[in-house]
């Protein structure tokens, strides 16, 4: 093998090794930012396919319904505690911040946070779900005003 081919081979090998290293680092970084979705029952009993429970300290998203009577607000701060439930069980959630306008008992929500001991989720974001028939009040008012029937004006045409 002549010197020129040998140098090209080294360059190609170095480029491939660099691409492999870059790909590995990107995948490792993405793995740390993935929030897996769970229901309250899956937190308690594991995913249906694998029966694997989420680890304490794991970042996750939990979707369920806010249990009626479970919302407890701290009067001196923005802290709120509530329970999320589904057909298989419930988990408690702590959140500090402003809740969405659509948040209420019996409403579906998705929380993002970390799993703590005792099936407790420390949330850093709460997203309220709404049904497909929901229309914001401002839009509904505008629609009613735009579709209001014009007032009838009767003109006397007999003159």
Curated annotation (Swiss-Prot):
Residues on the Periplasmic side?
30-159
Q: Which GO terms describe its molecular function?
A: heme binding; metal ion binding
Transmembrane segment boundaries: 9-29
- Main subcellular location of this protein, as a coarse class: membrane
Q: Which Gene3D superfamilies match?
A: Nucleic acid-binding proteins
Q: Where in the cell is it found?
A: Cell inner membrane
- What residues does heme bind to? 130, 134
Chain's role: Heme chaperone required for the biogenesis of c-type cytochromes. Transiently binds heme delivered by CcmC and transfers the heme to apo-cytochromes in a process facilitated by CcmF and CcmH.
The family annotation for this protein states: Belongs to the CcmE/CycJ family.
Identify this protein by name.
Answer: Cytochrome c-type biogenesis protein CcmE 1
Q: Which organism is it from?
A: Salmonella choleraesuis (strain SC-B67)
């Amino acid at each position: 093998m002549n010197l020129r081919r040998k140098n090209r081979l080294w360059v190609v090998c170095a480029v491939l090794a660099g691409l492999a290293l870059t790909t590995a680092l990107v995948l490792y970084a993405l793995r740390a930012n993935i929030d897996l979705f769970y229901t309250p029952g899956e937190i308690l009993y594991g995913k249906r396919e694998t029966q694997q429970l989420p680890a304490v300290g794991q970042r996750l998203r939990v979707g369920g319904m806010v249990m009626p009577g479970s919302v407890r607000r701290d009067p001196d701060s923005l802290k709120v505690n509530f329970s999320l439930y589904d057909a298989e069980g419930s988990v408690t959630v702590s959140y500090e911040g402003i809740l969405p306008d659509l948040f209420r008992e019996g409403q579906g929500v998705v929380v993002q946070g970390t799993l703590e001991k005792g099936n407790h989720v420390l949330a850093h974001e709460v997203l309220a779900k709404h049904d497909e028939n929901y229309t914001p009040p401002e839009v509904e008012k505008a629609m009613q005003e735009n579709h209001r029937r014009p007032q009838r004006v009767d003109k006397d045409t007999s003159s």
